[in-house]
């Protein structure tokens, strides 16, 4: 049985009623609930940059995760701090696994995270009583095992060296490869191209926009500029067999 007992976004309660619901859930199911954390955790200046009910978010996260049987970090901010942790940030933001050290954290990176991956992670636990196998960054292999490039619908165009040269050109309209327009699919692991978004409706490349590498650590710093062709060394790296054939 799955029961969503506390969610700031979805629950009708607010303020003290919402916080009371969280406390009641923790008391009713000690070491028997899954904590799903969204958003980065600011640590600078005593955690003042994010407070809930007058308490630092960091304090609440530590309290909730301490009594959880499992912790899932959803989205890039919860994964590694996201935009608040990018260069120039002052909040001291970190991801959940950078803050909670005494429990295994399942990281579902992405901006946005795909809800299908969250559902699959929880269903596997409910069914098998164990969380999915993960990579070295705590990301489930079923979702982050292959590069976006490997499963991309534009891969045949890449292999034929059919690249979009500018937005709106004939190649763009024909669905050619967006690598030269900045697509970071070769160096990004995610299952966006196979499960897509909005119930399988579409995903960025199918909409004519390249991958920005949002599942990658510190992507706001490491994947910019987004609209400049990827470093040729990435392709060289992949061609050496460190990933499967392009």
Outline where the language-model segments fall.
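Iron-sulfur-associated redox domains of electron-transfer enzymes in respiratory
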Residues: 1-193, 202-204, 220-225
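Short amphipathic alpha-helical patches
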Residues: 87-88, 234-238
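Short cysteine/histidine-rich metal-coordination sites, predominantly Zn2+-binding motifs
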Residues: 197-204, 225-235
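Residues that flank catalytic or metal-binding motifs in active/ligand-binding sites
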Residues: 207
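The −1 position to Zn-ligating cysteines in a subset of zinc-ribbon hairpins
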Residues: 210
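Short, cysteine/histidine-rich loop/knuckle motifs that typically chelate Zn2+
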Residues: 213
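Short Cys/His-rich local motifs and their 1-3 flanking residues in nucleic-acid-associated proteins
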Residues: 216
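Short Fe-S-cluster ligation motifs
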Residues: 240-246
